[in-house]
């Protein structure tokens, strides 16, 4: 069973869950749209974009799409430098928190797979997964911009 403190934390968090999820979803959509316009990004994977192959399904089934997106860096971008240049968005395996986090699946969640298997699954060295938090979307975009500048 849960401790009284854990129950209190859970109860307190549930009161703001809808607000936090809505902020994450809104921020993710804004960032996904911004990334599609960035010439240093070759592809953006976000079901809220009309260009996503499953957008019509997501539109029917989801309310807000998600706070998670992935994007592929152009080959000219050094992924490690990009990740290390981020200041507000933190490299982390943690997902769906109030703070934005990012990781390279090829180095984290899929690191134990061989290169051939990762390639079959669409996991390249330049693929990044961004879990968008509730920070101001303009601050997140500024952080991404400066990381692109430093890594190009």
Give residue ranges: language-model regions.
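PLP-dependent enzyme catalytic core of the Aspartate aminotransferase-like
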Residues: 20, 77, 84, 100-152
């Amino acid at each position: 069973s849960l401790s009284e403190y854990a129950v209190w934390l859970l109860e307190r968090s549930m009161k703001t869950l809808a607000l936090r999820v809505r902020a994450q979803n809104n921020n993710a959509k804004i960032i996904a749209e911004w990334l599609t316009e960035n010439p240093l990004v070759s592809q953006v994977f976000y079901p809220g974009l009309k260009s996503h192959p499953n957008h019509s399904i997501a539109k029917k089934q989801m309310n807000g799409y998600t706070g998670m997106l992935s994007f592929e860096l152009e080959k000219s971008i050094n992924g490690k430098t990009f990740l290390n240049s981020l200041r507000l968005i933190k490299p982390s395996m943690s997902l769906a928190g109030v703070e934005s986090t990012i990781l390279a699946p090829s180095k984290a969640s899929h690191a134990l797979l061989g290169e051939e298997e990762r390639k079959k699954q669409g996991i390249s060295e330049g693929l990044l997964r961004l879990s968008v938090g509730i920070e101001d979307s303009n601050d997140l975009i500024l952080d991404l911009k400066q990381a692109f500048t430093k890594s190009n």
